[in-house]
């Protein structure tokens, strides 16, 4: 197959043929609007309890903290994305900064933060509301009558249309605990469903984050089944609505953050519209996704510091010849050096050299999985899924390098035997190395420890295993990356740089000592005992060798030198005479092989075959 990756990008490829790489789909512009319900039940504090993990914040406080954390992540990691906060069900109403004292056209809707790239002032105002509880404008005051969901959705429609008209991903996050905002009012339900359909037609995806209280479950079928519009074609791969529980010993804040983080990055295909040829004339279209990708601190833009105020710099490339004349793009030709000379190619000729055939994933055979070695992993695996045009993705370019892959099935996420429950189940493309990618490494056999030491170490390893003997990378953030973002965040918000950062990768030494401290001491004693016995045996062996050296050596007879085969020293004239006199058959096999080897002829076979080879060589060369 052929697709573009992070290692095969060619700087000389034409702009129209370039494929979006991993960073392109990771940094897609996204617009998210939080719609948070401000009601009496959302403002109600959880009941007091002695449980350590019990909720201490109200549902509205947890939702605002979640939005604040989401904004912190976006302002640094994805600075081009937009975010806004819309409070509905409030006593006050506001839609942007209205001029002339005009009242808002959306009753009980308060646009706390307009949909835009988060600025430092937006983060500070939200932080004051979340951490310090400062609400001078009395925003968090519930209205006496519920807000119309049709007005809420229409307000969101206006926000997206005005601020993010051309964004590829636009999403509306609704956080509420009211599963029936309009009760049995069918007209209000119908109006809200129409507004939701308008949002869907606009390309806005509505995501619901319901909050359930103790003794009252959130029933999505009462109202929101008609609001969360899902296309039947993508229903099979849609995420289910997860409910966050309050006052049940679980942290509502952590639950909300977990559910929102699962939808934080929009689904974007690594490649799309790739033909998967199962058999001749049997082809389906697949998309590829890269669920695991290493994040690194990336420079998102250039900054010019030469003026009084720092400004974003726009870079452009200009080609200039030795006479300092600007060279037009049409004047530039591509050339390759052969034998010290440059061979020029036309653009269409250079493109034809890079075209290695159509873009296709073709099955060429089947092998057992046991034949796939662990060292064959040369690139990140790609998850493939059959779907239509519902996700944004990049099309594999025509000049992508061909690559051999193994198509491997993975277990279901709910399978207990699955070692990666955080990854989707399906087919994975496992890139295989070519001959140039494999190195010949001579590895000496490692020393084998004693069985007793191995058994004791097995107990230590078993007691230090992670839960379910499984490593989940989502639980261990990159400490250097998090520190980089923390410093940037402090600089952007004019805050003090934190002294230290929580590093989840640091081993828990106390817990390790509590679990295997005794086993480690026993293993160390056994190792000392085995090492002492080994050193003692080596010392005794060395003493025995010293005693043998001090004894006189017995006189040994010199072995006779082996008789060299005479065949290798025969000249061409001697070989010609032997052929004429028919004496080649009298030569031994060793002599025949010696002659053939000296003449560069294969010396493998029986005596009759060797004689025939030698006769043929003499007839052709002498």
Curated annotation (Swiss-Prot):
Q: Where are the transmembrane segments?
A: none
| GO annotation, cellular component aspect | chromosome, subtelomeric region; chromosome, telomeric repeat region; Ku70:Ku80 complex; pericentric heterochromatin; site of double-strand break
Give me the stretches of Basic and acidic residues compositional bias: 1-13
Catalytic reactions on record: ATP + H2O = ADP + phosphate + H(+)
Q: Is the keyword Manganese assigned to this protein?
A: no
Q: According to the UniProt entry, where is the signal peptide?
A: none
> Where mainly found?
nucleus
Cellular compartments annotated: Nucleus; Chromosome, Telomere
Tell me the segments the record calls region Disordered: 1-26, 537-572
SAP domain boundaries: 584-618
Asked whether the keyword DNA repair is assigned, the reply is yes
Q: Tell me the InterPro entries matching this sequence.
A: Ku70 (IPR006165), Ku70/Ku80_beta-barrel_dom (IPR006164), KU70_core_dom (IPR047087), Ku_C (IPR005160), Ku_N (IPR005161), SAP_dom (IPR003034), SAP_dom_sf (IPR036361), SPOC-like_C_dom_sf (IPR016194)
Gene Ontology annotations of biological process type = DNA recombination; double-strand break repair via nonhomologous end joining; stalled replication fork localization to nuclear periphery; telomere maintenance
Q: Keywords on this record?
A: ATP-binding, Chromosome, DNA damage, DNA recombination, DNA repair, DNA-binding, Helicase, Hydrolase, Nucleotide-binding, Nucleus, Telomere
Q: Which GO terms describe its molecular function?
A: ATP binding; ATP hydrolysis activity; damaged DNA binding; DNA helicase activity; double-stranded DNA binding; telomeric DNA binding
Q: Which residues form the Ku domain?
A: 276-463
The EC number on file is 3.6.4.12
- What function does the entry list? Single-stranded DNA-dependent ATP-dependent helicase. Involved in non-homologous end joining (NHEJ) DNA double strand break repair. DNA-binding is sequence-independent but has a high affinity to nicks in double-stranded DNA and to the ends of duplex DNA. Binds to naturally occurring chromosomal ends, and therefore provides chromosomal end protection. Required also for telomere recombination to repair telomeric ends in the absence of telomerase. KU70, of the KU70/KU80 heterodimer, binds to the stem loop of TLC1, the RNA component of telomerase. Involved in telomere maintenance.
**What do we know about how this protein assembles, alone or with others?**
Heterodimer of Ku70 and Ku80.
Family the entry assigns:
Belongs to the ku70 family.
* PANTHER family for this protein: KU AUTOANTIGEN DNA HELICASE (PTHR12604), X-RAY REPAIR CROSS-COMPLEMENTING PROTEIN 6 (PTHR12604:SF2)
Q: What is this protein called?
A: ATP-dependent DNA helicase II subunit 1
- Give the originating organism: Chaetomium globosum (strain ATCC 6205 / CBS 148.51 / DSM 1962 / NBRC 6347 / NRRL 1970) (Soil fungus)
Originating gene:
KU70
């Amino acid at each position: 197959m052929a697709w573009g990756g992070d290692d095969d990008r060619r700087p000389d490829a034409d702009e129209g043929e370039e494929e979006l790489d991993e960073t392109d789909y990771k940094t897609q512009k996204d617009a998210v609007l939080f719609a948070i319900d401000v009601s009496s039940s959302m403002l109600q504090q959880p009941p007091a309890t002695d449980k350590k993990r019990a909720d201490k914040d109200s549902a509205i406080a947890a939702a605002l903290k979640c939005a604040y954390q989401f904004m912190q992540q976006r302002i640094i990691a994805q600075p081009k994305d937009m975010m806004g906060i819309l409070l509905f069900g409030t006593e006050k109403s506001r839609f942007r900064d209205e001029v002339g004292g005009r009242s808002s056209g959306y009753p009980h809707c308060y646009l706390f933060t307009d949909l835009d790239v988060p600025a430092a002032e937006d983060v500070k105002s939200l932080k004051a509301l979340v951490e310090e509880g400062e609400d001078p404008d009395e925003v968090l005051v519930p209205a006496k009558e519920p807000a119309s969901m049709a007005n809420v959705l229409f307000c969101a429609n206006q926000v997206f249309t005005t601020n993010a008209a051309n964004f590829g991903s636009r999403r509306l996050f609704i956080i509420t605990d009211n599963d029936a905002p309009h009760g049995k009012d069918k007209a209000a339900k119908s109006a809200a469903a129409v507004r939701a359909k308008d949002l869907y037609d606009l390309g806005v995806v509505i995501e619901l984050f319901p909050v359930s209280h103790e003794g009252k479950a959130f029933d999505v079928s009462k109202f929101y089944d008609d609001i969360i519009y899902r296309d039947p074609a993508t229903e099979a791969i849609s995420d289910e609505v997860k409910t966050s529980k309050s006052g049940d010993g679980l942290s509502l804040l952590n639950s909300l953050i977990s559910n929102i983080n699962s939808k934080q990055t929009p689904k974007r295909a690594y490649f799309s519209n790739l033909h998967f040829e199962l058999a001749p004339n049997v082809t389906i279209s697949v998309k590829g996704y890269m669920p695991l990708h290493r994040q690194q601190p990336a420079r998102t833009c250039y900054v010019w510091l030469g003026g009084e105020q720092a400004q974003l710099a726009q870079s452009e490339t200009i080609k200039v010849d030795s006479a300092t004349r600007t060279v037009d793009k049409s004047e530039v030709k591509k050339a390759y050096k052969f034998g010290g000379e440059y061979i020029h190619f036309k653009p269409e000729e250079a493109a034809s050299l890079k075209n290695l055939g159509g873009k296709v994933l073709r099955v060429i055979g089947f092998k057992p999985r046991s034949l796939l070695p662990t060292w064959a992993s040369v690139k990140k695996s790609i998850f493939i899924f059959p779907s239509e045009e519902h996700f944004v993705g990049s099309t594999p370019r025509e000049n992508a390098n061909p690559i051999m892959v193994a198509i491997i099935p993975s277990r279901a996420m709910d399978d207990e035997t699955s070692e990666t429950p955080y990854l989707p189940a399906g087919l994975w493309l496992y890139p295989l190395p070519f001959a140039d990618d494999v190195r010949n490494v001579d590895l000496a056999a490692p020393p084998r420890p004693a069985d007793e030491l191995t058994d004791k170490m097995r107990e230590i390893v078993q007691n230090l295993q992670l839960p379910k003997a499984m490593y989940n990378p989502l639980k261990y953030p990159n400490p250097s990356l998090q520190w980089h973002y923390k410093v940037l965040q402090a600089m952007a918000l004019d805050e003090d740089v934190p002294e230290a950062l929580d590093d989840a990768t640091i081993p828990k030494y106390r817990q390790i000592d509590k679990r295997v401290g005794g086993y480690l001491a026993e293993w160390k004693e056994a190792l000392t005992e085995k090492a002492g016995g080994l050193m003692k045996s080596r010392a005794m062996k060395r003493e025995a060798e010293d005693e043998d050296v001090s004894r006189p050596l017995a006189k040994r007879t010199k072995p006779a030198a082996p008789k060299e085969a005479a065949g290798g020293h025969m000249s061409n004239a001697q070989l010609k005479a032997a052929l004429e006199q028919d004496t080649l058959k009298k030569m031994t096999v060793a002599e025949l092989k010696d002659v053939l080897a000296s003449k560069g002829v294969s010396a493998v076979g029986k005596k009759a075959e060797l004689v025939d080879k030698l006769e043929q060589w003499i007839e052709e060369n002498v």
